[in-house]
Amino acid sequence: MREAMQLVPMVVEQSSRGERSFDIYSRLLRERIIFLNGEVNDAVSALVCAQLLFLEAESPKKPIQLYINSPGGVVTSGFAMYDTMRYIRAPVHTLCMGTARSMGSFLLMAGEAGERTALPNASILVHQPSGGFQGQASDMLIHAEEIRRTKHRMTRLYAEHCGRTYEEFERAMDRDRFMTAEEALEWGLIDRIITEREIGAERDA
């Protein structure tokens, strides 16, 4: 992630006040576009949540575009972003470019109903949460119970957002389940597959 940030290009704009330069992500933020690129962790979650809150404060009804290319990561960090997406008034439109795995797919399906999209060659993965821990047997049992509760919560939310039954997603998440964009559409994780930027998205941005 650090190496990627070092390669971020700068955009130079001319105005009556002179010349200003922005990194490309800051420039896209002005168009209400947020990138979730890379692993989901506390630092990335804090950044995305802050951008969501900032854009809502600027315009509480104007859509926000969340572009996702993520292998997933920390469950609690993902839940923080999920809850913030639901908390703000501005609708969040999600788009998968590349891959949305684990918590990446969870955030993809959490977008505004009817506005969850993927590019044609996107790859989506759903699976149950996992965790590794050491310690006394009693502590391990406590952690195992917490993972069980987290799995139940995630399965319920997947089912609610995707219009499927709890049992269907429980079976789907029992093992790693990779999906093409077409399969994700069939499962209700996304609402449509797009091949080029839509006119409405350009107008909203």
Swiss-Prot record:
**What subcellular locations does the record give?**
Cytoplasm
Q: Please tell me which top-level EC class this enzyme sits in.
A: hydrolase
Please tell me where this protein is predominantly located. cytoplasm
GO BP term (any one): protein quality control for misfolded or incompletely synthesized proteins
Q: In the record, what terms sit under GO molecular function?
A: ATP-dependent peptidase activity; ATPase binding; serine-type endopeptidase activity
List cellular component terms (GO).
cytoplasm; endopeptidase Clp complex
Keyword Cell wall biogenesis/degradation assigned to the entry: answer is no
Name the Enzyme Commission number(s) assigned to this protein: 3.4.21.92
Catalytic activity reported: Hydrolysis of proteins to small peptides in the presence of ATP and magnesium. alpha-casein is the usual test substrate. In the absence of ATP, only oligopeptides shorter than five residues are hydrolyzed (such as succinyl-Leu-Tyr-|-NHMec, and Leu-Tyr-Leu-|-Tyr-Trp, in which cleavage of the -Tyr-|-Leu- and -Tyr-|-Trp bonds also occurs)
Recite the UniProt keywords alphabetically.
Cytoplasm, Hydrolase, Protease, Serine protease
* Active site, per annotation: S102 (nucleophile), H127
Q: Which family does it belong to?
A: Belongs to the peptidase S14 family.
Record text on subunit structure and interactions: Fourteen ClpP subunits assemble into 2 heptameric rings which stack back to back to give a disk-like structure with a central cavity, resembling the structure of eukaryotic proteasomes.
UniProt cross-references to HAMAP family, sorted A to Z: ClpP
Q: What does this protein do?
A: Cleaves peptides in various proteins in a process that requires ATP hydrolysis. Has a chymotrypsin-like activity. Plays a major role in the degradation of misfolded proteins.
Instruction: Give the protein name, as stated in the record.
Output: ATP-dependent Clp protease proteolytic subunit 1
Q: What species was this sequence derived from?
A: Rhizobium meliloti (strain 1021) (Ensifer meliloti)
From the broadest rank down, the organism's phylogenetic lineage runs:
Bacteria, Pseudomonadati, Pseudomonadota, Alphaproteobacteria, Hyphomicrobiales
